[in-house]
């Protein structure tokens, strides 16, 4: 008799995706991040659900409701900090997952890659609206500054901003709709993640060499389920260490002050995972130019498959491209650091150089290095 997991309509889907899935035998730990992202998403949805049971999306009570969660709700403090630091872990996994895709040429699976770019935008939107909910100083001013960027759009800008605000400033209507967005978006992310997997399973996974591995596949279970469990344990350990020993390490102290429209914080800055984009935005002295650069800094990922000029898929055997890839990583870390610094002399010019280098690397230097490597292969 055939096993039920291979015949039952629902079990068959799970079986084909997580049990009998043919997987390359040589994929490294860099391929763990996909499952870790799934784990992060589930944890965020669950902790978020329990937080939503006690949170009130109203300007007068939002801040107090967070205090109430931390002080009066059973284990409310740990749920709140797991959710806040879970977002940081989510972005760490997300950036590692994208870095892996860039390094090993996974973007050659265009449908999977494009859904991934849409997923990135959706996760960033979710994190942004979520940061507004505690209604602290940085929540309020972050929302004001970022939504105000839309006013740079010619002709419709101001109308658009007021439409998003639901009034003439960030207020009660804004908070209520941001809570609604923050609740619905994770489920949209979940649906997109399933589509992402669907497209991936059409082609099968890439591997470190970038060479087709159809002649050397192994079942996902038990080999990669065990490997993924190890990654999951490390992720949970890191998250618990962060949550229990340094819950506010990645947060902003300004957000412990209730929102006050009459007092602007000295340095308005987003959470650490947006600082690189914020630095690119600030490096251009023109409002519209800055907004376009900000948008392009993420949207450029969609053009990566078109910028691939190498005859090899992976960077595994391409030393020049490898060097430029790590320069790009260093550049992004520099931008992240600059984004958290005040707008004054040494930081401004360093941020401008780093921003130029970011676009130069992706649009010019890396495609050129690939062409040089193609020539060297003929020697």
From Swiss-Prot:
Name the cofactor(s): heme b
- Mostly located where? mitochondrion
Where does it reside? Answer: Mitochondrion inner membrane
Chain sites annotated for binding heme b b566: 97, 196
Q: Where does a ubiquinone bind?
A: 201
Q: Classify the source by domain of life.
A: Eukaryota
MF-aspect GO terms: metal ion binding; ubiquinol-cytochrome-c reductase activity
Q: Which sites bind heme b b562?
A: 83, 182
Q: How does it sit in the membrane?
A: Multi-pass membrane protein
Q: Which CDD domains match?
A: cytochrome_b_C, Cytochrome_b_N
Cellular compartments per GO CC? mitochondrial inner membrane; respiratory chain complex III
Membrane-spanning regions, if any?
33-53, 77-98, 113-133, 178-198, 226-246, 288-308, 320-340, 347-367
Question: How is its cofactor bound, per UniProt?
Answer: Binds 2 heme b groups non-covalently.
Other comment: Heme 1 (or BL or b562) is low-potential and absorbs at about 562 nm, and heme 2 (or BH or b566) is high-potential and absorbs at about 566 nm.
The protein's role, per its UniProt record: Component of the ubiquinol-cytochrome c reductase complex (complex III or cytochrome b-c1 complex) that is part of the mitochondrial respiratory chain. The b-c1 complex mediates electron transfer from ubiquinol to cytochrome c. Contributes to the generation of a proton gradient across the mitochondrial membrane that is then used for ATP synthesis.
Which family is it part of? Belongs to the cytochrome b family.
Subunit structure comment from the entry = The cytochrome bc1 complex contains 11 subunits: 3 respiratory subunits (MT-CYB, CYC1 and UQCRFS1), 2 core proteins (UQCRC1 and UQCRC2) and 6 low-molecular weight proteins (UQCRH/QCR6, UQCRB/QCR7, UQCRQ/QCR8, UQCR10/QCR9, UQCR11/QCR10 and a cleavage product of UQCRFS1). This cytochrome bc1 complex then forms a dimer.
* Record's protein name: Cytochrome b
């Amino acid at each position: 008799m055939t096993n039920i997991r291979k015949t039952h309509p629902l079990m068959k889907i799970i079986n084909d995706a997580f049990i009998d899935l043919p997987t390359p035998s040589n994929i490294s730990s860099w391929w763990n991040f996909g499952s870790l992202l799934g784990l992060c998403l589930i944890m965020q949805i669950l902790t978020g659900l329990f937080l939503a049971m006690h949170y009130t999306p109203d300007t007068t009570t939002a801040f107090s409701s967070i205090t109430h969660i931390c002080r009066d709700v059973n284990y409310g403090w740990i749920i709140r900090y797991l959710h806040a630091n879970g977002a940081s872990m989510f972005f760490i996994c997300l950036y590692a997952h994208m870095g892996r895709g860039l390094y090993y040429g996974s973007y050659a699976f265009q449908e999977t890659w494009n859904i991934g770019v849409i997923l990135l935008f959706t996760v960033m939107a979710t994190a942004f609206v979520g940061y507004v909910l505690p209604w602290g100083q940085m929540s309020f001013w972050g929302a004001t500054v970022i939504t105000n960027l839309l006013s740079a759009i010619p002709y419709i800008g101001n109308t658009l901003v007021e439409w998003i605000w639901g009034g003439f400033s960030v207020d009660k209507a804004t908070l209520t709709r941001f809570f609604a967005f923050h609740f619905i978006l994770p489920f949209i992310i979940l649906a997109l993640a399933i589509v992402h997997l669907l497209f991936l399973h059409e082609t099968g996974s890439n591997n470190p060499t970038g060479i087709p591995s159809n002649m050397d596949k192994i079942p996902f279970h038990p080999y990669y389920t065990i490997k993924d469990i190890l990654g999951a344990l490390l992720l949970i350990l890191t998250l618990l260490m962060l949550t229990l020993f340094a819950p506010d390490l990645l947060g902003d102290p300004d957000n412990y002050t209730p929102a006050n429209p009459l007092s602007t914080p000295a340095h308005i800055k987003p959470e650490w995972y947006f600082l690189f984009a914020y630095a690119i935005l600030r490096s251009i002295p023109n409002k519209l130019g800055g907004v376009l650069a900000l948008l392009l800094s993420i949207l450029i990922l969609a053009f990566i498959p078109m910028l691939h000029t190498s005859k090899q898929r992976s960077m595994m055997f391409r030393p020049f491209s490898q060097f430029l890839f790590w320069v790009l990583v260093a550049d992004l870390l520099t931008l992240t650091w600059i984004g958290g610094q005040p707008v004054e002399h040494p930081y401004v010019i360093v941020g401008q150089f780093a921003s130029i280098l970011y676009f130069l690397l992706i649009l010019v230097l890396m495609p050129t290095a690939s062409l040089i490597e193609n020539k060297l292969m003929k020697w």
